[in-house]
Amino acid sequence: MGKIIFYDDRNFQGRSYDCMSDCSDISSYLSRVGSIRVESGCFMVYERNSYMGNQFFLRRGEYHDMQRMMSMGMIFDTIRSCRMIPPYRGSYRMRIYERDNFGGQMHEVMDDCDNIMERYRMSDWQSCHVMDGHWLFYEQPHYRGRMWYFRPGEYRSFRDMGYSNMRFMSMRRITDIC
């Protein structure tokens, strides 16, 4: 089981909130998050309540202040919800599709891909089916830019999920011991 502790000030000072599962509204416990300690497991933190907005992946470690987290690639300064990524030790497999509802060109993916356009000759893809494993998708090649967490399931339309202007350009398996 994972455990993440949110503090309302930098350097683990002030009030804290211990979390060992998903939390859709951290603001119920703290008015702001200034630092984070992940004692075990892996988590996605979200800019808005109910797992909405920009996302950032956290593994076990200490995150002393939001400014440091922003220098690591996090592009937002407010954390309102978090989701625990369950431990997983199996194979990784997904299918990506050029169009909504699993239409158009399809490719099966089983490993990390630092540049989807180069490897698969796809400038864009609009749906996917994650069969096995947990994945991070990135808006730029080489695992840069904003990221999104995808767990096993069918994702028929990125546009319907609120990603209408989004292009995923690289993807990585979450292989950490979460």
Swiss-Prot record:
Gene3D superfamilies: Crystallins. GO terms for biological process: lens development in camera-type eye; visual perception. SMART domains: XTALbg. It comes from the Eukaryota. PANTHER family: BETA/GAMMA CRYSTALLIN, CRYSTALLIN, GAMMA M1-RELATED. Crystallins are the dominant structural components of the vertebrate eye lens. This is Gamma-crystallin M1.
